[in-house]
Amino acid sequence: MLSNNIDRTPEGVLTFAGYDVTQLAKEYGTPLYLMDEARIRANCRMYLQAFRDHFGPGSLPLYASKAASFKQMYRIMAEEGMGVDVVSSGELYTALSAGFPAERIYFHGNCKTDADLAYGVSQGIGFFVADNREELLALEKTAAEANVTQKILLRVTPGIDPHTYEAVSTGKVDSKFGAAVETGQAMELVKLALTLPHLDLRGLHCHVGSQVFGEDVYQRTLDIMVPFLASIREETGVTLSDLNLGGGYGVRYTA
């Protein structure tokens, strides 16, 4: 699993980003988690450039807080121009306390509490990603009490099997996350959201799963999501501007 920031000296000493890991272990103890800031920044820039090249200047890749949620990581993401998604008030607090711009934060999760909703609204975050009818109604109430209009995306399930590990497959029709396109539940949720005066529905989000190694999964997802956006326009007269395709690129956990 050696990558271009991991090497061995002629004496057989393992190095990471140019540092002798045995010396780091002596200085900081073990277990010790090492991250290469230069590599992280380079990856951010790669994604940002690819998005600009293929999706235009209005596109934005998001860093998933579940990967590593601590202040320095959020500072790096802020400096590199990334967005972030969070799934708890704790992650939101950490991002904000690191100075991450609230308008580039997306609050995900299918079990948000009233306290989560109130905290996010009070901090002026960019988007809530609403998962179900109950959340929509609760968020409408919270936004009305705060006298604000909150931007949202709706999470829907496209019915895609990414052929990954079952526990991290999230886009199938029977997923616990989001409303299914296939059953009509997603359209019902869209129509409800459009009636709520303190919610500004901007688009849709879906997440097909983690450990996705093939780009064909995203093409199949687009083949469902784009026609669904068209059907929303046909049935409601509203053109939604945002399409957020979620999913985790595969990581080599074994050699």
Task: List each language-model region with its residue ranges.
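Glycine-rich, aromatic-flanked loop segments that form ligand/cofactor-binding clefts
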Residues: 149-161
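A charged N-terminal "starter" segment
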Residues: 1-151, 187, 191, 196, ...
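Anionic group-transfer/hydrolysis microenvironments
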Residues: 38, 87, 133, 157-159, ...
